[in-house]
Amino acid sequence: MYPFRGLPVRFDTFHTIFRAFQYRNYRYYYYGQSISLIGVWVQNIAMGWLVYRLTGSALLLGTIAFSLQIPSLFITPFAGVLADRWDRRKVIVVTQILSMVVAFVLAWLTLTERITVGMIISLALVNGVVLAFDTPFRQSFVPDIITRREDLSNAIALNSSLYNLARFIGPPVGGVLIALVGEGWCFFINGVSFAAVIIALASMRIKKIRRPPRFGSVFSQLREGVGYAWHFRSIRYLITLVALSSFFGLPFQALMPLFAAEILGGDSQMLGILTGALGAGALTGAFFLASRKNIRSIPGIALRASLMFALGLSVFALSAYTALSVLALVVTGFGMIVHFNSTNTLIQSIADDDKRGRVVSLYSLTFMGITPLGSLLAGAIAEYISVPFTVFAFSLVCLASAILFGKRVKTVYTSLVRKMATGP
């Protein structure tokens, strides 16, 4: 039931880290995603390389990334309302089928040499719309397949580790496939990979969840969800922390090529080293969070991780030495993934089940939707005060928000304990 059985490591350690695997439905979900996410990263690399090969334009590369992310800002909140109304598993199946269709269309256009940059941007935008709709359903679906609330943090952390593993595996595989068979077949392979998660979802046995009848329009339900999150102090504190960390903390990733080339005097290999260091820290953080048995420790972990993220980022911003930059990024990656995953766990653990989809959509909006806006602001400011000082200034905002959250963490802990005592 648990991976890595037979290795010379204490079995109870793996039992703790992979305890969400005791749920049959979660195992299916995890294995299906593992194949699909690698395919997604293969497609991401191939799409970027295809645009670069056709145009050589950094601006158009940025436009592709913007097209993938910006729909979240407008669609995700409304998708969260529907996630509280509709069957989450069925909707996820539909979004995976739509993503599969986009991949196959990309493959056909590329293999027949009909592809243009405008088509790539349009299909990236379609993919972004599907992703924006899919995210609240996907995130609020995990508690549906995890019976015990105390195992929820483990399931969310394992999902994060899977994402980071795919980020490690997918790009190198994509690079090899581009060299061997070209971008078109990379898109085709990604389309096929979606079959894994579709089959996994179809194979699950889930008890029908009775949802209370909904009255009023989507807008009124959205307003109710926003009001609920705002007046629930613990959720308001958590979402505010995530919003500030996303807007001011995450844009540094878009500026990494400039750090590699202009600050450290490197090339694409240096960028790979920096990205790998960030990913190594993130992967370590995901497994660290998965190993935590007591969910009551998560509020304190969230606070310490947000401080670690801000401090690591500030050191990286001012570093002119490769070794120090790599070390700072490992710390930053660890703090980043533990910070965002632990706040996600807390939000899902303390929110009422009938409002979880809408609350998770607000988390997704602050985590994904506003980051492109922060990146635009960071790029504009960097033109005047330099990239390092921009990132350093942004890291100080993250540090201040973490310190302020520290004054509210007891409220979050109390909400969690109360929810654990009363149940769903």
Annotate each PLM feature:
Residues 10-71, 227, 231-278:
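Helix-loop boundary and gating motifs at the non-cytosolic
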Residues 58-59, 149-159, 268-269, 353-362:
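Loop-to-transmembrane helix entry/capping segments in MFS-fold secondary transporters
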Residues 123-165:
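Cytoplasmic helix-loop-helix junction between adjacent transmembrane helices
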Residues 48-55, 106-112, 169-189, 262-263, ...:
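Transmembrane alpha-helix termini and helix-breaking/packing motifs in multi-pass membrane transporters
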Residues 74, 78, 85, 91, ...:
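C-terminal transmembrane bundle of multi-pass solute transporters/carriers
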